[in-house]
């Protein structure tokens, strides 16, 4: 109604409404349950999202709708939700910051391109999104430099492709207690699908039920191109709790076409289980400086690796914690069970299973291992070594199927050898070449107790 036609009755009614807006009842009116972002100014999405979050509990980006040029930070208020059915796009500098109780959810067709989700609170949820874009270093960032405790993080059902890192956690300054990262598909990445870095304060972390495909770092970055990586801080052979990444499970992972699938540095109290790997070879991330292995463990204590199936892939590396050529720690106290590696149809030799283990009070248990056209290699000497139900075949032109290098007396790494109350226990262990002949190399046996049953090779005479 034009102002010049305003009647006295209309004017009085409007005046009464203005007075009502100043009453306590009016100020207490809650935000609407949901608002639609396409009802706001399309020429300034930053201001529009800020206004929308102030007016609604959930801000919806409708299907088929595109919000572009999101190139700065937007804070999602505590307890509020961004629900994406359309598309949000930026140039790599934009981010949505999640605070306590914030959620970013998606539906079919909902996605983000070149925008980062920055987690800075407890009880946050990121779910049901497609994410992509090489603009930002990572699609989801969890960390920051402020000291805080963040609890109950949920990341579920994401599809992340054609990006650098998918999920990056920098954990030195803060703590996460309880994180579930589940049911995602990661493909065509330059960086890691999940990197949980210097996460020495975190606990109760579950990373499970993911598909990882085609991770190939071609941009020259060092240490990029891992499927799932977790790391503590400085290696220490005493394995102090406050320097290790710990209390986590990595489970139900299907991975293919990358250089390294699972990676742990300076970790303890963890489980890796139910891994299915194909084509984990050196053809990927050739200049990234990372070892080729389905599972790579460096300087770790008290862990379990169980039910790993690998085909045409490099197997497992369990090795020293090394910095600048200095051997700082050796793996100890772990179980490796139910491992299958079949490289029968691979055109070239790859790592089978290489294990370095030791320390004065330590154990290693290797059980139910079957490998074809791959070698099992043991280096250094843990206090107690148990090997059960192991069948290994390697071609004679490559080397022995089973090698045990216990004698490290002339090696700088001999400092990690166990020397007191040592035990070697072997049962149902068979190592052969392609002709079915025994294929074993053992340098020296001087264990205090040796128990042997059903093996296809002779042990060297015991020497002090």
Curated annotation (Swiss-Prot):
Sorted alphabetically, which InterPro entries does this protein's record hold? Colanic_acid_synth_WcaM (IPR023882), Pectin_lyas_fold (IPR012334), Pectin_lyase_fold/virulence (IPR011050)
This protein's UniProt keywords: Lipopolysaccharide biosynthesis
Q: Which GO terms describe its biological process?
A: lipopolysaccharide biosynthetic process; slime layer polysaccharide biosynthetic process
Its pathway is: Slime biogenesis; slime polysaccharide biosynthesis
Q: Which SUPFAM superfamilies match?
A: Pectin lyase-like
Q: Which domain of life is it from?
A: Bacteria
Name of the protein this chain belongs to: Colanic acid biosynthesis protein WcaM
Q: What organism is listed for this UniProt entry? A: Shigella flexneri
């Amino acid at each position: 109604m034009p102002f010049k036609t305003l009647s006295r009755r209309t004017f009085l009614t409007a005046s009464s409404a203005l007075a009502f807006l100043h009453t306590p009842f009016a100020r207490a009116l809650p935000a609407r349950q949901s608002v639609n972002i396409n009802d706001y100014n399309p020429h300034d999405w930053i201001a529009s999202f800020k206004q929308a979050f102030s007016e609604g509990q959930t801000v919806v980006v409708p299907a088929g709708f595109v919000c572009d040029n999101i190139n700065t930070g937007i804070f999602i208020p505590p307890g509020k939700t961004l629900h994406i059915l359309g598309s949000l796009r930026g140039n790599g500098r934009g981010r949505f910051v999640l605070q306590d109780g914030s959620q970013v959810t998606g539906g079919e067709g909902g996605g983000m391109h070149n925008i980062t989700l920055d987690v800075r609170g407890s009880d946050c949820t990121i779910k049901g999104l497609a994410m992509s874009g090489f603009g930002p270093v990572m699609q989801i960032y969890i960390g920051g430099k402020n000291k805080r405790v963040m609890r109950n993080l949920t990341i579920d059902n994401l599809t992340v492709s054609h990006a650098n890192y998918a999920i990056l956690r920098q954990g030195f300054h803060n703590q996460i207690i309880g994180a579930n990262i589940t049911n995602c598909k990661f493909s065509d990445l330059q960086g890691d699908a999940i990197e949980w870095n210097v996460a020495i304060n975190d606990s109760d972390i579950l990373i499970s039920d993911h598909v990882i495909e085609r991770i190939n770092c071609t941009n020259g970055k060092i240490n990029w191109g891992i499927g799932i990586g977790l790391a503590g801080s400085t290696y220490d052979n005493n394995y102090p709790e406050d320097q290790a990444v710990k209390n986590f499970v990595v489970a139900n992972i299907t991975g293919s076409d990358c250089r390294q699938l699972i990676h742990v540095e300076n970790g303890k109290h963890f489980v890796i289980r139910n891994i299915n790997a194909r084509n984990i070879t050196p053809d990927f991330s050739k200049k990234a400086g990372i070892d080729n292995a389905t599972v790579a463990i460096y300087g770790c204590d008290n862990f379990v690796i169980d039910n790993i199936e690998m085909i045409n892939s490099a197997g497992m590396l369990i090795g020293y914690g090394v910095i600048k050529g200095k051997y700082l720690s050796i793996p100890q106290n772990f179980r490796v069970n139910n491992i299958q590696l079949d490289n029968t149809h691979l055109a070239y030799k790859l790592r089978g299973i290489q294990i370095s283990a030791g320390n004065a009070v330590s154990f290693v248990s290797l059980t139910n291992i079957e490998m074809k056209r791959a070698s099992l290699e043991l280096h250094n000497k843990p206090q107690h070594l148990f090997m059960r139900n192991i069948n290994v075949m390697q071609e004679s032109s490559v080397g022995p199927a089973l090698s045990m290098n216990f004698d490290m007396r002339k090696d700088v790494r001999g400092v990690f050898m166990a020397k007191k109350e040592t035990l070697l226990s072997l049962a149902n262990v068979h190592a052969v070449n392609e002709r079915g002949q025994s294929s074993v190399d053992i340098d020296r046996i001087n264990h205090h107790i040796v128990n042997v049953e059903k093996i296809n090779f002779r042990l060297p005479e015991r020497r002090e």
